[in-house]
Amino acid sequence: METTNAKTKITVQTTVNSPVSKVWESFNAPEHIMKWNQASKDWHCPASENDLRTGGRFKHTMAAKDGSFSFDFEGEYINVIENKLIKYVLGDGRTVQVKFEGSGNQTHVIEVFDAETSNTMELQQTGWQAILDNFKGYTEAA
C-alpha cells in the first residue's frame, strides 16, 4: 500500500496460467463475470452489464446468496486499451487501474485501487484479492 495525494492505494495481483486474450475475455464478458465475481462462497454476482470502452459504464450486482444483502458495484471507464489496461472511476470517485501483462500462456494481472474509509485496509485488500483469486481459478479451469 502507498499513499499518494492523501489517497491510499491498495494493490492486489495474480498470475493466471492463460494467454492474455482469454484472461481479457474472462475479466470483461458479463457471462464470465457472473461466475467468478464474489469474495466468498456465500456471495454471488447475479447480474452484470459491461460497456467496455472509454466513456462506457459497468454495473455488477453483488448479493448474499441467502438474500440478506446486495449492492451494485458500478462505475465509468476512463481508459481502455484492449488486452493491456482498464482504468475506471467508481460512483464514489475512487479510481481503479487494472493492468494485464501477457507473456505466452501466462498473464500477470495487477489491480491498484483507491481505498475507501468504511473498512480497514486489510479487509479491503483481502476482499479484492479473494475476488481476483476466484477469477484466476475460474479462468484457468474454463
What are these regions, as identified by a protein language model?
Residues 1-43:
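Hydrophobic ligand-binding cavity/cleft-lining segments
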Residues 11-12, 31-68:
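Short beta-edge strand/loop motif at the mouth of beta-sheet-based domains
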Residues 14, 47-50, 73-78, 95-102:
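Hydrophobic/aromatic beta-strand elements that line small-molecule binding cavities or substrate pockets
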Residues 85-131, 135:
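Beta-strand/loop substructures that line and gate deep hydrophobic ligand-binding cavities in soluble
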